[in-house]
From Swiss-Prot:
Protein name: Chitinase 2
UniProt keyword GTP-binding, yes or no: no
Catalytic residues in the record: E154
One GO BP: cell wall macromolecule catabolic process
Signal peptide: 1-32
Family named by the database record: Belongs to the glycosyl hydrolase 19 family. Chitinase class I subfamily.
Purpose of the protein: Hydrolyzes chitin and plays a role in defense against fungal pathogens containing chitin. Its overexpression confers enhanced resistance to sheath blight pathogen (R.solani).
Length: 340
């Protein structure tokens, strides 16, 4: 039989346990990333900056180096309503169109045959709902065309006299052929795992440990320890490309913001000749090697894919397609892209 004092003690302990459980739950919720690539491309409320780590705030820690979105406030463009599941990428890219766009990806001569599936593309896109879900229908289609245009160049198996033309052979490769190195650079934040190599893999030919690390963290996979997943798991492969597409890096906007009209050039951008359009995306992806020195066959190839895909969607390409006269964002390649 318990005494009143014992009963009071038990009640106090029960209350303390309840408070501890509540505190743990609140702490877990507080740790969940709020925005950016870590949260499926979400933007912060009330025009807050999204830090490189996926948190919302207003100080330089959030709005400074690595800021992912709304780094100078929302600007004049309103944040779009997130698409409902019924308005996902599949609603503008039905299976038959996907097959026509990537016509020869499963050709017997393509090393990636059978890898890049429609199902994997949709599954990866669902993790980034703003991709192909921002703006009106034409803008949504143009973003998919631009994404497939850039990634088709990175994975092309085409040649000038190829059947159905050179721009029907995107997604022929899934990893770099004969990589010259292990693409490991010393990094305390993204250390290379023993024996692992970070050469180009996937639609964007993701390269270097400093890209595999943050890409893996954003999609919930340890790619520093398992870089081969980008060439063996098609959904992971597409997700890494979409992570790169959706994520601003350094002084570069995201490709997503450029093609959807959410990016406005700064005075420095204008002075560098960087104007809104597909050409800036090429600059983001590989400007250090391809932009700013006049006509370049690689840039023309990227444009060729994009024009074909826009034609298949029945939309215009917009202006400023090349980066021939744009100063690069960096002095070198942003991804360490592989030339097939």
């Amino acid at each position: 039989m318990s005494t009143p004092r014992a009963a009071a003690s038990l009640a106090k302990k029960a209350a303390l346990v309840a408070l501890a459980v509540l505190a743990a739950a609140l702490a877990t919720a507080a740790r969940a990333e709020q925005c950016g690539a870590q949260a499926g491309g979400a933007r912060c409320p009330n025009c807050l900056c999204c830090s490189r780590w996926g948190w919302c705030g207003t100080t330089s820690d959030f709005c400074g180096d690595g800021c992912q979105s709304q780094c100078s406030g929302c600007g004049p463009t309103p944040t779009p309503t997130p698409p409902s599941p019924s308005d996902g990428v599949g609603s503008i890219v039905p299976r038959d169109l996907f097959e026509r766009l990537l016509l020869h990806r499963n050709d017997g001569a393509c090393p990636a045959r059978g890898f890049y599936t429609y199902e994997a593309f949709l599954a990866a896109a669902a993790a980034f709902p703003a991709f192909g879900g921002t703006g009106n229908t034409e803008t949504r289609k143009r973003e998919v065309a631009a994404f497939l245009g850039q990634t088709s160049h990175e994975t092309t198996g085409g040649w000038p006299t190829a059947p159905d033309g050179p721009f029907s052979w995107g997604y022929c490769f899934k990893q770099e052929q004969n990589p010259p190195s292990d693409y490991c650079q010393p990094s305390p934040e993204w250390p290379c795992a023993p024996g692992r190599k970070y050469y180009g893999r996937g639609p964007i030919q993701l390269s270097f440990n400093f890209n595999y690390g943050p890409a893996g963290r954003a999609i919930g996979v340890d790619l520093l320890s398992n870089p081969d997943l980008v060439a063996t798991d098609a959904t992971v492969s597409f997700k890494t490309a979409l992570w790169f597409w959706m994520t601003p890096q350094g002084n570069k906007p995201s490709s997503h913001d450029v093609i959807t009209g959410r990016w406005a050039p700064s005075p420095a951008d204008a002075a560098a000749g960087r104007a809104p359009g597909y050409g800036v995306i090429t600059n983001i992806v590989n400007g250090g090697l391809e932009c700013g020195h006049g006509p370049d066959d690689r840039v023309a190839n990227r444009i060729g894919f994009y024009q074909r895909y826009c034609g298949a969607f029945g939309i215009g390409t917009g202006g400023n397609l090349d980066c021939y006269n744009q100063r690069p964002f960096n002095s070198g390649s942003s991804v360490g892209l592989a030339e097939q």
